[in-house]
């Protein structure tokens, strides 16, 4: 069964097809999933992700069932595989936002319904789909290639963007503090994909070098959910990595800024630059709705072929 746990399991053609279908559904909404049911399991808080999934299945003609970790017997020690067997047998899709990626993998092994990663500590693939759709809408793909800079932590967004750029043949430059490292296994996968796609990938510690000649600038919060106790240390380590006017002046003249939100002005991005690019950032957030619609339809079609 086809799940959506990471974009590394998807081909270039499948990824671009999802983006194109999202564009179609944004222009012309359709009830393509009449009476289908989506279970939404959250171990972490969510604003945009929950809204995108709940509205997506509803507007497609289906229903959403919200389940926090406190609602489930998982919180009392029930094995993930037992919960997966029950929920996966009752619904058509399962969306999960989890603390550990291994929880997703275990759930997917036993679920009869396709499982969607709505964020883990390793990957955030639905966000990158929304980013890709936004890049397309803002005409920042030339001949199918985008020039991207990612400035920030070696986190789930960095991993997902590295993998996606490698599969699609993009040019991506990543900049982060010297003591931050990308997983060797993820880096090796990206390098192998780049040999196939022709992607140009670079990793360094100078944000200005990464920003040169880029049309798309991506940043993310320095302190992810669950890292609140590390806030003081991380802010100190990321000093100098803020996206401000000076930083954006190094990118191409009409470059856009993307941020998955929530944004912390004065840290990863300045107030002035955030507001200057607010239109694209909040359209990026809205576009999550349409890529989720496309994703649900894709998984439903895949399941129907089995």
Swiss-Prot record:
UniProt binding sites for carbamoyl phosphate: 46-49, 73, 97, 124-127, 260-261, 288
Signal peptide: none
GO CC term, one of those recorded: cytoplasm
Keywords recorded for this protein, A-Z: Amino-acid biosynthesis, Arginine biosynthesis, Cytoplasm, Transferase
Pfam families listed in its UniProt record: OTCace, OTCace_N
Enzyme Commission number(s) from the entry: 2.1.3.3
Annotated positions binding L-ornithine: 156, 220, 224-225
Claim: Amino-acid biosynthesis is one of the keywords in the record: yes
Pathway assigned in UniProt: Amino-acid biosynthesis; L-arginine biosynthesis; L-arginine from L-ornithine and carbamoyl phosphate: step 1/3
InterPro entries, alphabetized: Asp/Orn_carbamoyltranf_P-bd, Asp/Orn_carbamoylTrfase, Asp/Orn_carbamoylTrfase_sf, Asp_carbamoyltransf_Asp/Orn-bd, Orn/put_carbamltrans, OTCase_ArgI
Top EC class, one word: transferase
One GO process term, biological-process aspect: arginine biosynthetic process via ornithine
Protein's cellular compartments: Cytoplasm
SUPFAM superfamilies the record matches: Aspartate/ornithine carbamoyltransferase (SSF53671)
Reactions catalysed, as given in the entry: carbamoyl phosphate + L-ornithine = L-citrulline + phosphate + H(+)
Quaternary structure annotation from Swiss-Prot or TrEMBL: Homohexamer; dimer of trimers.
Biological function: Reversibly catalyzes the transfer of the carbamoyl group from carbamoyl phosphate (CP) to the N(epsilon) atom of ornithine (ORN) to produce L-citrulline, which is a substrate for argininosuccinate synthetase (ArgG) involved in the final step in arginine biosynthesis.
PANTHER family tied to this protein: ORNITHINE CARBAMOYLTRANSFERASE, MITOCHONDRIAL, ORNITHINE TRANSCARBAMYLASE, MITOCHONDRIAL
Protein name: Ornithine carbamoyltransferase, anabolic
């Amino acid at each position: 069964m086809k799940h959506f746990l990471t974009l590394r399991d998807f081909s270039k053609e499948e990824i671009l097809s999802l983006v194109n279908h999202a564009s179609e559904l944004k222009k012309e909404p359709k009830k393509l999933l009449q009476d289908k049911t989506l279970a939404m399991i959250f171990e972490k808080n969510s604003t945009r992700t929950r809204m995108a999934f709940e509205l997506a299945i509803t507007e497609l003609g289906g229903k959403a069932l919200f389940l926090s970790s406190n609602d489930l017997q998982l919180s009392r020690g029930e094995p993930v595989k037992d919960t997966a067997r029950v929920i996966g047998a009752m619904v058509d899709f399962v969306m999960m936002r989890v603390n550990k990626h291994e929880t997703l993998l275990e759930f997917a092994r036993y679920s009869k319904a396709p499982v969607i990663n709505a964020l883990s500590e390793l990957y955030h693939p639905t966000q990158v789909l929304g980013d890709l759709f936004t890049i397309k809408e803002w005409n920042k793909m030339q001949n199918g290639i985008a020039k991207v800079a990612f400035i920030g932590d070696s986190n789930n967004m960095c991993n997902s963007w590295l993998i996606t750029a490698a599969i699609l043949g993009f040019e991506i430059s990543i900049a982060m503090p010297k003591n931050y490292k990308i997983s060797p296994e993820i880096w090796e996968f990206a390098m192998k994909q780049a040999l196939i796609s022709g992607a140009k990938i670079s990793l360094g510690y100078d944000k200005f070098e990464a920003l040169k000649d880029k049309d798309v600038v991506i940043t993310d919060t320095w302190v992810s959910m669950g890292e609140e106790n590390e806030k003081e240390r991380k802010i100190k380590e990321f000093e100098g990595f803020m996206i401000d006017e000076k930083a954006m002046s190094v990118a191409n003249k009409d470059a856009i800024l993307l941020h998955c939100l929530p944004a912390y002005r004065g840290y990863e991005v300045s107030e002035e630059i955030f507001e200057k690019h607010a239109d694209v950032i909040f359209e990026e957030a809205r576009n999550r709705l349409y890529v989720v619609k496309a994703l649900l339809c894709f998984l439903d079609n895949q399941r129907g072929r089995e």
